[in-house]
Every structure is written in C-alpha cells, then in structure tokens.
Curated annotation (Swiss-Prot):
Protein name (record): Cytochrome c oxidase subunit 6C
Top-rank taxon: Eukaryota
Compartment(s) of residence: Mitochondrion inner membrane
Gene name of the encoded protein: COX6C
GO CC terms of this entry: mitochondrial inner membrane
Mitochondrial matrix side of membrane: 1-13
Taxonomic classification: Eukaryota, Metazoa, Chordata, Craniata, Vertebrata
Membrane topology: Single-pass membrane protein
Record GO biological process: oxidative phosphorylation
SUBUNIT field: Component of the cytochrome c oxidase (complex IV, CIV), a multisubunit enzyme composed of 14 subunits. The complex is composed of a catalytic core of 3 subunits MT-CO1, MT-CO2 and MT-CO3, encoded in the mitochondrial DNA, and 11 supernumerary subunits COX4I, COX5A, COX5B, COX6A, COX6B, COX6C, COX7A, COX7B, COX7C, COX8 and NDUFA4, which are encoded in the nuclear genome.
Pathway the protein acts in: Energy metabolism; oxidative phosphorylation
Organism: Trachypithecus cristatus (Silvered leaf-monkey)
Family: Belongs to the cytochrome c oxidase subunit 6c family.
Membrane side Mitochondrial intermembrane: residue ranges: 55-75
Amino acid sequence: MAPEVLPKPQMRGLLAKRLRFHMVTAFVLSLGVAALYKFRVADKRKKAYADFYRNYDAMKDFEEMRKAGIFQSVK
C-alpha cells in the first residue's frame, strides 16, 4: 500500500484572498446597516419633523413666551 500523499498547501496569495473576502463582507454589512438606519431611524425622524412643522405657528409661540415674560427686551 502506498502512503497517503497530503495535498500541498497553498502558500501564495493567502493574504490577498482573505482580504478580498473580508473587504467584500465588510462592505456588504456596512451597506446593510446604513439602509437599516435610514429606514428605521432617519425616515421616522424626518416624518416627525415634517408633522411638527406642518402645524407649527411661530408667532403663536412667540406671543405665549412674550406674555409669560421670558424675553427681557420685548414687553
């Protein structure tokens, strides 16, 4: 019986192969996290600001603060 011959290990390009794999993985994961943040946080925040300013009356708030005495220069 002939002894089993082990295959020769690949010695060239190991770092490049690992870097290529990990860079692609990191890029895909970062795109996924950015998309999740946009749809779960940023869009909700943007909608909340739009809803607030849709009905916001700056003059009404100003008059309320003036009547409360917050401003020293406006009587």
